[in-house]
Amino acid sequence: MSELRLCCDLLVQQVDKTKEVTTTGVSNSEEGIDVGTLLKSTCNTFLKTLEECMQIANAAFTSELLYHTPPGSPQLAMLKSSKMKHPIIPIHNSLERQTELSTCENGSLNMEINGEEEILMKNKNSLYLKSAEIDCSISSEENTDDNITVQGEIMKEDRMENLKNHDNNLSQSGSDSSCSPECLWEEGKEVIPTFFSTMNTSFSDIELLEDSGIPTEAFLASCCAVVPVLDKLGPTVFAPVKMDLVENIKKVNQKYITNKEEFTTLQKIVLHEVEADVAQVRNSATEALLWLKRGLKFLKGFLTEVKNGEKDIQTALNNAYGKTLRQHHGWVVRGVFALALRATPSYEDFVAALTVKEGDHRKEAFSIGMQRDLSLYLPAMKKQMAILDAL
């Protein structure tokens, strides 16, 4: 990549020199310098280096790496991309639709990633150039297995009940001429679930503890639950962002499981590392939480654009990126993002991927349901981000 950058700089210099010669009419041939030959040589080197970079990129995104499952990987709560020809993956079954709360023997947040990807994650801090096979599950001690599963189901049932109450309230206010279009919800009309209403754990489920403490386990579970949104944009398009989110979730959880009794909130984890003078150490939980927050803000910004009526997914993503992650990325990462934007799906395909039942996106009730769900989900997400900003 450094060679490519060098070629770019040389090209700029030599093009400027050529323009200068053309304008002044003065040639450097007396000095033995043929600007045209130099420019041609640099162009050839640039194209050759660019071709090598593309070969490396293609090798990184081969289907073998994207879909290889490590031997013995757990099958619960798999956040992965299906081997479908279509880049958008509708969530037609529970494994694709949600991140389940389950347990493992050491009570950790499992994220199974193949060896090739592990090497990349060790060499990159905040962006990774491969997709992953991820097992994302939050758990407690072995004797609370059933409780966690039940709690996840209760949270989902409570959310569905809240949605029905929300719809009834909208119905009652439907006669108000100043009511927004989504308020025009007629009683008895079909209620269609969406990706956001069927999450096992959502940011809207989080109950803050004393002093606005964000419960660590519930927060990490909510983060895992929203990661599949990136899959709805295509299995490889935003693999780098997905890998970044997943790795940072894992780092925070690794800190959490070292002392669950003490690190009940995110604030306590940060305070502990600040007092130990390790908060700014590479791969610390505090650093991971910082990048996790940035990634979540990007997702929130994108979903807000969609909720506000932006029908061009590329524009929605670009606007969200410009307001959040772009300022933290160098020119190389920005270039990768620009390339990823070219492969984004249409609005119709993206919305179709957020359905629970195939074909629901064609119904008017689904659009109303999306507005309803995002109206509950995004403010809750914003609240968590505001608390993290204050840390």
Curated annotation (Swiss-Prot):
One of its GO terms (molecular function) is ceramide 1-phosphate transfer activity. GO terms for biological process: ceramide transport; intermembrane lipid transfer. Gene3D superfamilies: Glycolipid transfer protein (1.10.3520.10). InterPro entries: GLTP_sf (IPR036497), Glycolipid_transfer_prot_dom (IPR014830). Pfam families: GLTP. GO terms for cellular component: cytosol. PANTHER family: GLYCOLIPID TRANSFER PROTEIN-RELATED, PROTEIN PLEKHA9-RELATED. This is Putative protein PLEKHA9. The gene is PLEKHA8P1.
